[in-house]
C-alpha cells in the first residue's frame, strides 16, 4: 500500500527530472542544438539519449512481467537492444555521421530523391507514433496506480512530465535526463537485486519454483506438471520457442538501427569517436538492467499469484495456495515488489524511477517523430524555415501536438488494441528504414530511386498484411526479405544499364 513516504520518494524523482529538463533548455539556442545537440554532445549525453529511450517500460516493468511467467527468456528485449547498440556504434556511427544528413529519412532522400523521403517519412512517423502511444498508455497506468486520479488526468500528467523531459532541451533534455535516469535505474536495480539475493539466492528460488509449481494446482493452470518442465520454462532463453524468442531479439536489433531517436544521438556526438563510444557504452549497460528485472520477476513468481490464476484454480475445484500476494495482473509484478519488499523511501524513489523510465521512452520517441515531420516533410516545402528560430518553435510545437494526440487516441482506444499495435510499430519502422538506409550508405548511386520507392512501400505493406492475416511468425522478417529482393533487383538492373 502506498504511504506518505512513498509519495515523497516519487515526487523527489519527478522534481529532479523536471529540473534537469529545464536546465538543459539553457543549452538550446537554435534548432540544431535542439535536434542534434549542435553536434556538441559528449559520450555520456549520447549514451543517455539512447538509453533514455530504449530502457523504457518494456525493459523494466515488461521484463519483470515476462520473467514472472517465462524466466530467462525475458532477457531478449534488453539483450537485443544491447546488440543493436553494438552494431549502431561499431558499424553505423561513422557512415551515418559522414552522410551529411541529420535524419535517417534524410539519408534515404539524398540517395533516392525527395519522393522516397516523403513516403518513408510518413510511414516511419506512423510507426514511431504508435510506440509513443504505447509509452503514454504505460505512463498513464503507472500514474493511476501511484496517485488517486482518473485515467484522463493521469494521461495529461504523463505528457506534461514528458514535455518537461524533452521539450525544453531536445536532445540535451533527453540526453541529460537519460543519464540521470540511468543512474537512478542502476541504483534501484542493484538494490532490488540485493534484496532478492538476501531473501532467496538463485538455488533457493529454483527450489521454491519447483515446490510451488510442480504437481500443484497453480502449476496445472500454467501447464506445468513436473519439476523438469518448471526448470525448462524458467531457466531457458528460448522458453517460448526459438522462433519467437530469437525473433524478438532480432526485431529489437533491427528496431534500434531503424529508429530516428537512436541515430539522432549519433549525430549529436561531438565526433565520430564520441558517437561510437556512446553507442557502445549503451550496448554494455542495457543488458544488465534486464537481468535485474528477471531476478525480480522470478522472485515474485514464488511469492505471488494473479487474480486470474485464483479464479482458474477455484473453477477446477482446487485449493488456492496460502501465503501468496494477489496481483490483479502480471503488469503489477515490479511495482508490487517495490511496495512489498523495498524500504518505503527507496520504494518511492524506485516507483518514480520506473515512471520516468516509461516517460523517457515516450519523450525520446516524440522528439524523433517531431524531427522527421519538421525536417523531412515541412522544411522540404518551406526551406526558408531551416536554421531559424521558427524551426525550433515548430519542432517544440510538433512534440506537444504528438503528445496531445497520443492522449486523445489513448482515451478513445482500448489498451489491449494499443498493445497489439506495438508489434506493428516495430515492424513498420524496420521495414521502412533498415534496407533502404543500408543501401543508401553502402551502395550509394548504384540503385535507382524507383526501386527504393518500391521497397519502402512494399516492406511496410507486407507487415500490415501479415498482422491483419495474423501470421504465426513475425511478418517483419518477410518484409525485410521483400525489401532486400527489390533493392537487389534494382542493383542488378543498374549494372545492366551501365554495362550497355
Residue ranges of model-derived segments:
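A generic transmembrane alpha-helix motif of multi-pass inner-membrane proteins
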Residues: 1-23, 449-500
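Loop-to-transmembrane helix boundary motifs in multi-pass membrane proteins
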Residues: 114-118, 374-414
Amino acid at each position: 500500500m502506498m504511504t506518505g513516504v512513498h509519495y515523497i520518494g516519487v515526487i523527489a524523482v519527478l522534481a529532479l527530472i523536471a529540473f534537469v529538463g529545464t536546465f538543459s533548455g539553457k543549452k538550446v539556442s537554435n534548432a540544431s542544438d535542439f535536434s542534434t545537440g549542435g553536434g556538441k554532445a559528449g559520450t555520456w549525453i549520447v549514451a543517455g539519449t539512447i538509453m533514455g529511450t530504449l530502457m523504457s517500460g518494456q525493459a523494466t516493468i515488461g521484463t519483470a512481467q515476462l520473467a514472472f511467467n517465462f524466466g530467462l527468456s525475458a532477457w531478449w528485449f534488453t539483450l537485443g537492444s544491447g546488440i543493436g547498440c553494438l552494431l549502431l556504434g561499431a558499424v553505423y556511427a561513422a557512415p551515418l555521421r559522414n552522410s551529411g544528413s541529420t535524419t535517417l529519412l534524410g539519408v534515404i532522400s539524398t540517395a533516392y530523391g525527395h519522393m522516397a523521403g516523403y513516403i518513408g517519412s510518413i510511414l516511419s512517423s506512423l510507426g514511431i507514433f504508435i510506440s509513443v502511444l504505447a509509452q503514454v498508455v504505460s505512463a498513464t497506468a503507472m500514474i493511476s496506480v501511484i496517485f488517486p486520479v482518473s485515467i484522463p488526468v493521469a494521461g495529461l500528467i504523463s505528457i506534461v512530465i514528458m514535455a518537461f523531459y524533452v521539450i525544453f532541451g531536445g536532445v540535451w533534455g533527453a540526453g541529460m535526463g537519460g543519464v540521470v535516469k540511468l543512474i537512478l535505474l542502476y541504483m534501484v536495480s542493484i538494490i532490488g537485486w540485493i534484496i532478492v539475493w538476501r531473501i532467496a539466492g538463485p538455488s533457493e528460488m529454483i527450489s521454491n519454483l519447483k515446490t510451488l509449481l510442480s504437481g500443484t494446482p497453480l502449476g496445472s493452470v500454467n501447464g506445468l506438471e513436473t519439476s523438469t518442465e518448471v526448470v525448462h520454462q524458467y531457466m531457458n532463453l528460448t522458453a517460448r520457442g526459438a522462433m519467437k524468442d530469437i525473433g524478438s531479439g532480432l526485431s529489437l536489433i533491427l528496431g534500434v538501427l531503424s529508429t530516428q531517436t537512436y541515430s539522432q544521438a549519433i549525430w549529436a556526438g561531438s565526433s565520430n569517436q564520441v558517437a561510437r563510444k556512446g553507442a557502445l557504452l549503451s550496448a554494455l549497460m542495457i543488458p544488465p538492467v534486464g537481468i535485474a528485472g528477471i531476478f525480480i520477476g522470478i522472485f515474485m513468481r514464488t511469492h505471488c499469484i494473479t487474480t486470474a490464476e485464483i479464479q482458474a484454480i477455484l473453477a477446477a475445484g482446487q485449493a488456492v495456495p496460502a501465503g501468496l500476494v494477489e496481483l490483479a495482473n502480471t503488469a503489477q509484478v515490479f511495482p508490487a515488489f517495490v511496495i512489498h519488499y523495498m524500504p518505503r523511501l527507496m520504494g518511492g524513489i524506485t516507483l518514480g524511477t520506473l515512471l520516468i523510465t516509461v516517460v523517457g521512452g515516450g519523450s525520446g520517441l516524440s522528439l524523433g517523430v517531431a524531427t522527421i515531420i519538421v525536417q523531412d516533410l515541412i522544411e522540404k516545402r518551406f526551406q526558408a524555415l531551416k536554421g531559424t528560430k521558427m524551426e525550433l518553435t515548430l519542432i517544440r510545437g510538433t512534440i506537444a501536438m504528438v503528445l496531445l494526440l497520443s492522449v486523445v487516441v489513448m482515451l478513445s482506444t482500448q489498451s489491449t488494441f494499443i498493445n497489439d499495435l506495438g508489434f506493428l510499430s516495430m515492424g513498420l519502422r524496420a521495414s521502412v528504414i533498415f534496407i533502404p538506409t543500408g543501401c543508401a550508405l553502402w551502395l550509394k548511386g548504384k540503385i535507382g530511386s524507383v526501386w527504393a520507392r518500391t521497397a519502402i512501400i512494399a516492406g511496410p505493406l507486407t507487415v500490415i498484411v501479415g498482422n491483419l492475416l495474423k501470421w504465426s511468425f513475425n511478418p517483419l522478417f518477410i518484409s525485410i526479405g521483400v525489401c532486400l529482393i527489390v533493392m537487389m533487383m534494382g542493383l542488378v538492373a543498374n549494372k545492366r544499364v551501365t554495362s550497355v
